[in-house]
C-alpha cells in the first residue's frame, strides 16, 4: 500500500486548520472540523431533497455535533435511551427522533415513550409486544435482512433484521396490537461501495408494500433506507451524488409521484467521517528479528482508544506523517497500539508503507476518523483515558 499525499484529502487551508489545532497538545487526540460536517449535511440535503435525514448518533454522539445538526434541521436516530437523553438535552423536539435499535429493554421503550418518542424500529415479536405494551399507538417500522455484506467494509445485516416474510407477519400483528404499521427499514452495510445493494433491497421492499396493500389492506407509508453511504478512506469511492442519483432512480421506477412513500435516511459515517483527524505519536519502532524486513510501529493510539473499526483490518484509514512529503525510501510496517493486549494491532496484513526515516516521537495522523472513533473509545483500559476531542470550525 503506497504512501499517501495530504493533498489527496485536504486543501492546504483546510489541513492548516487541523495542524494548528494540534499544536502543543499531548497525543492522542481527535480534531473535528464542524464546518466539514455542515458542508456534507447541505450536500446530502440537496441530493436527497425529498428525504428526511435522521443522523445516526452512534457515529459521533458529541453535543457539539448534535447542536450543529439540530440547528441545520436534521432529525436524529437514537440507539439507546442514553443517546435519547443527550439529544433531548440539546433541545431537539421528540418528533424529530426515532428509536432505531431493534434490541431494547421494555423499560427503555416505556422511558422513550414517556419522553415523547412514537417511532420505533423492530424485528421480532417479543420487541413488538414490548412496544405495544409500553408505547401504545406508536408507529413501527420493521427491519428486514438484505444482501450487501459482501461489498460493505463493515457488514450490519446479520444481527439486525428479519426475513421479509416474518416482517410481513409483524406488520400485520402490529395492527392487531393497536400499533401503526408504518414502514420498512433495511441497512445494506456500512461503507457500502456497491450502489446496486440498495436496488436489491428496494425490490424486496416494493414487493412487501404491494403485498401489504393488496393482501392485508395495510398501506405502508415509509421506507427507511438506513445509512451505509461511504466516505473516503484508502480505497476510492464514488461521490455521494452517484448514490443519490441511482437510489432516486430506483424509487421513481417503483413508485408514482402520488404513491411515493416517506423516505428516511440514517447517515452517520458519510456525514461526519471526513471531519476528523486523529493525531498520535510514534511510541516505539522495532523488528522481531535481525533479518525481519517489516518494522513494527507502535503508536499511542490503538483499538481501545478509538480505532476499533480496524478490527480484522475492516476499515483502512489513510495514515499520514509529514515525512512522507520528503521521504526517499519507504518500507512495510505493522501498525499497533499501546495497550497490553495482543489484539491491539491495527494493520498487519494490509501492507501499509511508512518512511524509513520515521522515528520515535514523530506524529502520525489518521485521516477520515470523524466517525466511530471517539464514540468507541474505551474508558481507562490499561489506565489509558478516553480519547480527547478538539472541535474547530
Where are these regions (language model features)?
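Short, glycine/charged-enriched secondary-structure capping and boundary segments
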Residues: 68-69, 91-93, 113-114, 134-137, ...
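A charged N-terminal "starter" segment
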Residues: 1-138, 176, 180, 214, ...
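Structural preference for beta-strand elements that scaffold enzyme active sites
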Residues: 52-54, 75, 94-98, 119, ...
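Short, solvent-exposed polar/charged micro-motifs at secondary-structure junctions
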Residues: 40-42, 63-67, 193, 273-275, ...
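Active-site beta-loop-alpha junctions enriched in small/polar residues
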Residues: 58-62, 79-82, 102-104, 123-125, ...
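Charged (often Lys/Glu-rich) extended helix/loop segments that serve as interaction or gating elements
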Residues: 246, 252, 258-393
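Short glycine-rich, flexible loops that bind phosphorylated cofactors or substrates
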Residues: 129, 149, 373
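Active-site loop/helix belt of alpha/beta enzymes
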Residues: 148-286, 346, 382-384
Amino acid at each position: 500500500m503506497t504512501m499517501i499525499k495530504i493533498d489527496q484529502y485536504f486543501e492546504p487551508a483546510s489541513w492548516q486548520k487541523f495542524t494548528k489545532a494540534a499544536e502543543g497538545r499531548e497525543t492522542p487526540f481527535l480534531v473535528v472540523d464542524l464546518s466539514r460536517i455542515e458542508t456534507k449535511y447541505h450536500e446530502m440535503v440537496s441530493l436527497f431533497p425529498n428525504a428526511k435525514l435522521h443522523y445516526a448518533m452512534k457515529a459521533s454522539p458529541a453535543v457539539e455535533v448534535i447542536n450543529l445538526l439540530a440547528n441545520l434541521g436534521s432529525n436524529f436516530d437514537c440507539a439507546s435511551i442514553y443517546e435519547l437523553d443527550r439529544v433531548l438535552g440539546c433541545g431537539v423536539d421528540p418528533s424529530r427522533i426515532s428509536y432505531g435499535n431493534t434490541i431494547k429493554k421494555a423499560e427503555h421503550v416505556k422511558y422513550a415513550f414517556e419522553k415523547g418518542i412514537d417511532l420505533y424500529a423492530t424485528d421480532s415479536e417479543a420487541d413488538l409486544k414490548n412496544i405495544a405494551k409500553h408505547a401504545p399507538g406508536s408507529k413501527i417500522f420493521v427491519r428486514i435482512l438484505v444482501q450487501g455484506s459482501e461489498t460493505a467494509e463493515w457488514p450490519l445485516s446479520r444481527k439486525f433484521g428479519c426475513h421479509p416474510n416474518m416482517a410481513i407477519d409483524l406488520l400485520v400483528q402490529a395492527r392487531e396490537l393497536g400499533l401503526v404499521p408504518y414502514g420498512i427499514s433495511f441497512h445494506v452495510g456500512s461503507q457500502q461501495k456497491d450502489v446496486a445493494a440498495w436496488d436489491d433491497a428496494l425490490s424486496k421492499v416494493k414487493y412487501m408494500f404491494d403485498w401489504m396493500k393488496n393482501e392485508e389492506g395495510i398501506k405502508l407509508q415509509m421506507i427507511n433506507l438506513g445509512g451505509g453511504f461511504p466516505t473516503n478512506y484508502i480505497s476510492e469511492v464514488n461521490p455521494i451524488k452517484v448514490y443519490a442519483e441511482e437510489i432516486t432512480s430506483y424509487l421513481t421506477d417503483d413508485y408514482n409521484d402520488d404513491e411515493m412513500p416517506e423516505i428516511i435516511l440514517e447517515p452517520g459515517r458519510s456525514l461526519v467521517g471526513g471531519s476528523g483527524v486523529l493525531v498520535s505519536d510514534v511510541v516505539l519502532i522495532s523488528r522481531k528479528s535481525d533479518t525481519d524486513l517489516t518494522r513494527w510501529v507502535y503508536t499511542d493510539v490503538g483499538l481501545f482508544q478509538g480505532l476499533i473499526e480496524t478490527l480484522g483490518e475492516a476499515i483502512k484509514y489513510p495514515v499520514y506523517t509529514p515525512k512522507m512529503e520528503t521521504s526517499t525510501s519507504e518500507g512495510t510496517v505493522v501498525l499497533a497500539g499501546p495497550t497490553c493486549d495482543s489484539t491491539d494491532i491495527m494493520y498487519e496484513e494490509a501492507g501499509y508503507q511508512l518512511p524509513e526515516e520515521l522515528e520515535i516521537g514523530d506524529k502520525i495522523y489518521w485521516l477520515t476518523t470523524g466517525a466511530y472513533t471517539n464514540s468507541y473509545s474505551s474508558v481507562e483500559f490499561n489506565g489509558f483515558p478516553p480519547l480527547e476531542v478538539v472541535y474547530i470550525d
